[in-house]
Amino acid sequence: MTSRVSHTSVDSRNAYTQSLFWAEVLGYSENPEDPNEPGHEECLLYSPDHQHRILFIEVPEDKAVKNRLHFDLRPTDLSQADEVARLLGLGASVHADLRRDDGGWVTMLDPEGNEFCVLCSELEVGDPLAFPAD
């Protein structure tokens, strides 16, 4: 017997603004029959295939320490550099640039200071997590 992940929860000072940012980053959407709105204490996003959900939950305290869990993003149709530029335009900031000639990543912060990483794109390295062909 096993379990499956129902959704990923993210503590937030403002669940609504975080849901707007991450919807733009990931191409996720809200439930049109139960849209996220300012003042909602919980805001839910769905992946395009509805296989993953992210729940932003308002909490009273600010983020105080480094995340123990974070998203590693692999751009699908832009280079790593172009994706970093796009995310900067959405309100993210660069925390650490760890790019190397053979790959590396950029650690960024979302508008509330949560870390996430931007890896090399699929265009640059293929899909390293793909299952090997039989």
Question: At which residue positions do the language-model features occur?
Answer:
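Nucleotide-cofactor and metal-assisted catalytic machinery
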Residues: 39-40
